Design a protein with these regions (language model features):
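Membrane-interfacial helix termini and the short, flexible loops that connect transmembrane helices
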Residues: 1-87, 91-94, 98-134, 141-167, ...
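Individual transmembrane alpha-helices with interfacial aromatic-anchor signatures
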Residues: 86, 202-206, 242, 246
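Short alpha-helical packing/oligomerization segments
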Residues: 200-217
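Conserved small/polar residues in nucleotide/adenosyl-binding loops
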Residues: 248-250
Length: 250
């Protein structure tokens, strides 16, 4: 049991929190706003929803850090539960991407008459996989190396190399996102109009979104590392972010 835990047991009895409800409200507003934007180019509702989600994410991160770092609630038993929870979350994310790959392979292996019974559709100009896609793949693999370097430095108590590894990983994540935005801006096909564009942008777009979220998580870990929060035997927040990044690499 953590010496900082004020309770007489190893379990964390969480206090009432407004963030789950506010997060769901923000996500609902964001989704409705996105639909309105797709149909009318009106951004204001989507931006309101996005602002709510960002605010709730920050506050929720803050509360969890306070509970684990300052109040001592993240005992070894609690950390086991957190690991189970993160494992199940990653499993659900794998199934999410399986759905999009399923849609892609269903459309490509059995092309319908609506697209000329050929794959890809005849009017599609494919991206060269040996240019930006290859560069971004190498960037992801390199980021896996740097986050592993940071993790080994953490377990060995080397705070300097931990921070260096996280800086490198965050930088690579930002570069990846920049390349993907450039790729989308110069693509010759749109999201709507055919199944190829829909499956391409949904699968790669959600992958890019996960890279962005992983980068945000690592920025939080970087700030906490600079503040001296992580210890060799107490750093599940870092582990969770590294696991999430491993999902992206797959």
């Amino acid at each position: 049991m953590s010496s900082r835990n004020p309770n007489s047991h190893e379990y964390h009895l969480v206090e009432p929190s407004p963030w789950p409800l506010l997060a769901s409200i923000g996500a609902l507003i964001l989704c409705i706003g996105a639909v309105i934007y797709f149909r009318t180019d009106d951004l204001w509702l989507m931006l309101i929803g996005l602002a709510i989600v960002i605010y709730v994410t920050y506050m929720w991160f803050r509360d969890i850090i306070i509970e684990g770092e300052h109040q001592g609630h993240h005992t070894p038993v609690v950390q086991i539960g957190l690991r189970y929870g993160m494992t199940l979350f990653i499993a659900s994310e794998v199934m999410f991407f399986v759905a999009w790959f399923w849609a892609y392979f269903n459309a490509s292996l059995f092309p319908t008459e609506q697209i000329g019974s050929v794959w890809p559709p005849a009017e599609i100009h494919l991206m060269d996989p040996w240019h930006i896609p290859l560069i971004n793949t190498l960037i992801l693999l390199l980021s896996g190396t740097t986050v592993t370097w940071a993790h080994h430095a953490l377990t060995e108590g080397n705070r300097k190399e931990l921070i260096q590894g996280l800086w490198c990983t965050v930088g690579l994540g930002i570069i990846f996102t920049g390349f993907q935005v450039y790729e989308y801006m110069h693509a010759d096909f749109a999201f709507s109009g055919h199944i190829y564009g829909a499956t391409f942008y949904m699968a790669t777009g959600f992958h890019g979104f996960h890279v962005l979220m992983g980068t945000v998580m690592l920025i939080v870990c970087l700030g906490r590392s600079i503040a001296g929060h992580f210890k060799a035997d107490h750093h599940f927040g870092f582990e969770a972010a590294a696991w999430y990044l491993s999902l992206i690499h797959i």
